């Protein structure tokens, strides 16, 4: 009879357990391969970007090997670049390749030919950005960089800094010799400690009176009057104001 040919319950349970174990093992193996494929894909893209940027004079710093990355996969390209500098590489203008460097924490483009910084808006890990002595005039894309702590725009032709009000973690802002007139938007930067406004046409610094975190302010060669500077100093007794 058919009933006598059926495997005992213990055997059936063992078979079910073995099948479940096999299925779980296959799923885990697939996940591992997917992760390794993603790492390999990112490494390949970064390898191309780095080769291109190195040919233009860039220098790099890479992260330490992540704990999850096997030793045999550890190469310069499998680790994310955390710092890139192209300082005074006058021919460098196109920042689009940098969008592939998602682990980037610091970027120095001072003295380059960069004009458009919109491709940098997706660099969510970026903490420091130097754009001094560039032709960058539109900084609105930088409002997306929520982790940014340092921003240097010395002598860049910037006029509108209202978008920077979204940078809640910003601690250092250099607007020396820019075309900025209105700094009222900066009143939203509650963590700002250093602000450089020298050699600008800024005349009204009253909005900065709410920045209790501010410790250093430069207003040399501005339109700020002695009376305004005095009032600001009274509102911010712990801030060193230089004019």
Which residues fall in each region the model found?
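Leucine-rich repeat
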Residues: 78, 98-104, 120-126, 142-148, ...
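LRR N-terminal entry segment and analogous cap-like coil->beta motifs
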Residues: 55-132, 149
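Alpha-helical transmembrane signal-anchor/signal-peptide segments
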Residues: 42-58
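Conserved "Asn-ladder"/turn position within leucine-rich repeats
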Residues: 89-90, 112, 134, 156, ...
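Hydrophobic membrane-insertion alpha-helices, especially the h-region
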Residues: 22-37
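Conserved hydrophobic beta-strand positions in leucine-rich repeat
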Residues: 82-86, 107-109, 127-131, 149-153, ...
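Leucine-rich solenoid repeat scaffolds
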Residues: 207-243
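Per-repeat structural element of leucine-rich repeats
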Residues: 93-94, 115-119, 137-141, 159-163, ...
